[in-house]
Amino acid sequence: MVSRVLAQRVSQTLGQPVTVENRPGSGGIIGSAEVARSPADGYTLLVNSTVLAVDKWFYPNVAYDARKAFAPVALLATIPSVLVVPADSPYKDARSLLAYAKANPGKVSFASAGMGTSIHLAAALLAAQAGVDLLHVPYKGSTPAAADLIAGRVSMMVDSITAQQSFIKSGRVRALGVTSLQPAPSLPGIPPLAQAADLPKFEVLTWFGLFVPSRTSPDIVKVLNTAMNEALKTPEVQKALADIGASAQGGTSQALGVLWDNEIDRWGQLIVHHRLNTNEL
């Protein structure tokens, strides 16, 4: 969705059409591998997220080393996630949910869109910081995961605001807290988990960045970075992103590279320490 919001505006800036092609499968690995093999001419771009920082742990046979295969161009947007439970859940707040989980190890389950997805990692970090043992139930995508959450087959889910916003507003799920340090404008009245769960350091933002094959010339990277930053500054793009719960970002290619390195280190430590790639928490 972030790609589609930007495509039309960037097309105007560059003076040529920008086409968005979704390449699902294996957490985005299939699409990423295709871009990695593409000519480094600035015409085949990759929009990817947190998964680009963790794919090597969950997909050991992946055909590329992401940090060597791609060059960062610009940070596009960030989206907080939200902790949700079924509408008829007995838990009215994050503290009571985590208190029950601590007293009953393995009895509270959480749904994810699959191993290594941002949904999986956000819940795993919450469990690690809260010192609780949660049962991970991975699904093949967020849609079936959300369906089972609504039906009460799993206890909780830490999903993107974009995906859960309509369910929250329709009363099909109950929101207990957002993963940003500040309240999310799109979900007024829902507290940050840093406060609601007494975890002052807890923050998870799913980020979306633009990347190109690493062989791409710095001049092309600069042109693309300028186009993205111009688009991200426009009121219409900022509003369109805000409507899906996202915040426009921007900045230098170097800044995205630093974020990427920090995310590789942050999530790598969590994955290895808690053996998340073996589905154990």
Swiss-Prot record:
<dbReference type="Pfam" id="PF03401">
    <property type="entry name" value="TctC"/>
</dbReference>
<dbReference type="InterPro" id="IPR005064">
    <property type="entry name" value="BUG"/>
</dbReference>
<comment type="similarity">
    <text>Belongs to the UPF0065 (bug) family.</text>
</comment>
<dbReference type="InterPro" id="IPR042100">
    <property type="entry name" value="Bug_dom1"/>
</dbReference>
<protein>
    <recommendedName>
        <fullName>UPF0065 protein in clcB-clcD intergenic region</fullName>
    </recommendedName>
</protein>
